[in-house]
């Protein structure tokens, strides 16, 4: 779903509309320029580049005069990245790479941030930190589109939630409504 929204895949049916404009045929880099950024499953940071170089790569749509301020904002949100700014990204822990992937996406100043399985492979304490950051971003006005297997964590931050099965929406509601749903509790929350 996220690869279709971000222009990496083309929909066979339907359309993707963002801010009233159909994105059919719009190249992925132009979608980023329109205010959308994706943090892919598995992070996909530039492993041979430093933390700071990775962040600069995320700012390619921004004027050069704003890049330093953008990096400072990311370091404020992710202090661990500031400590590691000259370190090669491939040597970071999984949690640090997830922070870097999120920070790189934030460098483009997105209106819509798409996160694909941000908790995948992370220790529980890091999952909690990542979801705290997701809450902070949402509170600050960034719209978040989250795809996440950890239903409890995802529903705890969701204004709206959808359960997809084989590409079709089978349930929808607020995060609280789905958390209270017997079907969701039985299928996804172990109850």
What residues fall within each predicted segment?
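Glycine-rich phosphate-binding loops of nucleotide-dependent enzymes
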Residues: 1-191
């Amino acid at each position: 779903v996220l690869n279709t929204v971000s222009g990496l895949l083309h929909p066979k049916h339907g359309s993707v509309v963002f801010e009233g404009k159909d994105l059919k045929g719009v190249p992925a880099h132009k979608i980023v320029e329109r205010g959308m950024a994706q943090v892919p499953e598995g992070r996909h940071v530039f492993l041979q580049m430093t933390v700071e170089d990775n962040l600069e790569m995320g700012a390619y749509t921004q004027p050069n005069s704003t890049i330093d301020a953008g990096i400072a904002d990311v370091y404020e949100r992710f202090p661990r990245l500031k400590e590691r700014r000259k370190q090669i990204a491939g040597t970071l822990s999984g949690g640090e790479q997830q922070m870097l992937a999120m920070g790189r996406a934030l460098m483009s100043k997105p209106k819509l941030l798409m996160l694909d399985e941000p908790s995948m492979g992370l220790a529980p304490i890091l999952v909690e930190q990542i979801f705290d950051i997701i809450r902070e971003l949402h509170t600050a006005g960034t719209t978040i589109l989250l795809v996440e297997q950890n239903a409890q964590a995802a529903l705890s931050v969701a204004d709206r939630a959808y359960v997809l099965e084989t590409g079709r929406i089978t349930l929808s509601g607020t995060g609280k409504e789905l958390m209270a749903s017997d079907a969701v509790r039985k299928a996804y929350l172990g109850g």
